[in-house]
């Protein structure tokens, strides 16, 4: 019952998490004091540490008490035992494969479409992923992150536009980035691959550094 106890304790602990919102004049930043997350955020992700530990996302290493929901043939949906939000899921691949976006981009789109009430996001292997050696996404309640609701305020003039598909710069909110607005999954894929190809890849890194957040409307 260890995994269940950890999960239950940490979800219960969310009730005591301290949250403070800062009004930045047109947008907000929300800070969260959540001590239980140190296990995840403080995880060692250097090559030696990854090699010496068992992968905690591989099915054979999951506690028998860990409930899992198969998603297609490639993924499992798990309750995150170290949650940030009341509804927080980790969605790893069943097969141990590195955290890279291109091989699982189509899965990213399908997951988001099937989990429409949620925001699905991806942290790159050097951009915050606590398991850079095992491909996974996360899903949280849509609207619980300020950017979900505020993003439309900060996209104005598009960089590129083809029919109803656009790339916007995201500026003025201390979270610079790019926003893809696409009418179809095929269009979203074409635009994303153009952006991906233009991003720099640092020496020794497997892909450009990135964090991705996706919603289906």
Regions found by a protein language model. Name each.
Residues 93, 133-140:
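Catalytic metal-binding acidic patch
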């Amino acid at each position: 019952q260890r995994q269940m106890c950890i999960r239950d304790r940490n979800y219960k602990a969310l009730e005591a998490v301290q949250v403070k919102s800062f009004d930045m004049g047109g947008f907000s930043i929300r800070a969260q004091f959540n001590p239980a997350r140190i296990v995840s955020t403080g995880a060692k992700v250097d090559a030696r540490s990854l090699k010496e530990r068992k992968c905690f996302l591989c099915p054979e290493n999951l506690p028998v008490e860990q409930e899992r929901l198969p998603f297609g043939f490639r993924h499992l949906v798990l309750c995150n035992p170290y949650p940030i939000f009341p509804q927080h899921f980790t969605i790893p691949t069943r097969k141990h494969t590195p955290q890279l976006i291109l091989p699982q981009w189509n899965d990213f789109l399908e997951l988001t479409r099937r989990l429409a009430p949620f925001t699905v996001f991806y942290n790159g292997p050097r951009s915050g992923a606590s398991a850079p050696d095992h491909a996974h996404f996360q899903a949280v309640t849509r609207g619980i992150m300020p950017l979900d609701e505020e993003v439309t305020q900060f996209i104005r003039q598009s960089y590129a536009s083809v029919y109803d598909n656009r790339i916007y710069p995201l500026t003025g909110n201390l979270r610079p980035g790019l926003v893809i607005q696409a009418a179809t999954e095929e269009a979203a894929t074409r635009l994303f691959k153009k952006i991906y190809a233009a991003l720099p890849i640092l020496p020794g890194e497997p892909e450009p550094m990135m964090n991705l957040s996706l919603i289906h409307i």
